[in-house]
């Protein structure tokens, strides 16, 4: 069996420690050697980003320059269309073949809205889901049929993610950082410090570009 590949999608507007540090901890917990970050171009489930795709890509490059765990995949940025996870995972599965273990990392908040995602039922055909737990969010889905779906796919053993190519959901005990891109944008607009919220090269770039003002 080939090594588990993990993908981490998002808007990253801007990228911050709340994105990076839980995934770094996750990698240590379950034995990931590489996490591929996939920034959205046009996110279908949330407001459109304030920074353009070139700026968000550059901020990610700055944030991961000294972090060999991470690599960047630009495929969604190159689509002039909504960024659907189901479509991206189908592409990855076709490229990697049927036997490579593949996982998609999401937050617990995203799990609760997962049944609203485009072709959500196909996602576990192509990948596992790794859910980074977040305090304040329930562990149960809102509707019984979705709770049953969760329980049918749930595993408490991260080794299952390495031994099977797709189909499992794993709830990871990762640290929670009370940081969000919304908070960072608001602080920047108010002229407040964000030194401890995101990597210094990213903050320098934001200031140079006059972003989020």
Swiss-Prot record:
GO MF assignments: ATP binding; nicotinate-nucleotide adenylyltransferase activity
Enzyme class label: transferase
Example of a GO biological process term: NAD biosynthetic process
Keyword tags: ATP-binding, NAD, Nucleotide-binding, Nucleotidyltransferase, Pyridine nucleotide biosynthesis, Transferase
Pfam family, one: CTP_transf_like
Catalysed reactions listed for this entry: nicotinate beta-D-ribonucleotide + ATP + H(+) = deamido-NAD(+) + diphosphate
Matches recorded under CDD domains: NMNAT
Top-level taxon: Bacteria
InterPro entries per the UniProt record, alphabetical: Cyt_trans-like (IPR004821), NadD/NMNAT (IPR005248), Rossmann-like_a/b/a_fold (IPR014729)
Annotated metabolic or biological route of this protein: Cofactor biosynthesis; NAD(+) biosynthesis; deamido-NAD(+) from nicotinate D-ribonucleotide: step 1/1
EC number in record: 2.7.7.18
Alphabetized Gene3D superfamilies for the sequence: HUPs
Function: Catalyzes the reversible adenylation of nicotinate mononucleotide (NaMN) to nicotinic acid adenine dinucleotide (NaAD).
UniProt similarity note: Belongs to the NadD family.
Name of the molecule in the record: Probable nicotinate-nucleotide adenylyltransferase
Gene from which the chain derives: nadD
């Amino acid at each position: 069996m080939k090594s588990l590949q993990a993908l981490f999608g998002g808007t990253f507007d801007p990228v911050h420690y709340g994105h990076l540090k839980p995934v770094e901890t996750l990698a240590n917990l379950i034995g990931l050697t590489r996490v591929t970050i996939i920034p959205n171009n046009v996110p279908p489930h949330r407001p459109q980003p304030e920074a353009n795709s070139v700026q968000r890509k550059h901020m990610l490059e700055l944030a991961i320059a000294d972090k060999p765990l991470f690599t960047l995949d630009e495929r969604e940025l190159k689509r002039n269309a909504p960024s659907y996870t189901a479509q991206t995972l189908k592409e990855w599965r076709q490229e990697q073949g049927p036997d490579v273990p593949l996982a998609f990392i999401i937050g617990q908040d995203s799990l609760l809205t997962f049944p609203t995602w485009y072709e959500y039922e196909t996602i576990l055909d192509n990948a596992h889901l790794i859910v980074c737990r977040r305090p304040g969010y329930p562990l149960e889905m809102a509707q019984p049929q979705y709770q049953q779906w969760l329980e049918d796919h749930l595993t408490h053993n991260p080794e299952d993610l390495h031994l099977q190519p797709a189909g499992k959901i794993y709830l990871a005990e990762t640290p929670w950082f009370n940081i969000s891109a919304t908070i960072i944008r608001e602080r920047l607009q108010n002229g407040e410090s964000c030194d401890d919220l995101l990597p210094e090269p990213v903050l320098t770039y934001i200031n140079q570009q006059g972003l989020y003002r």
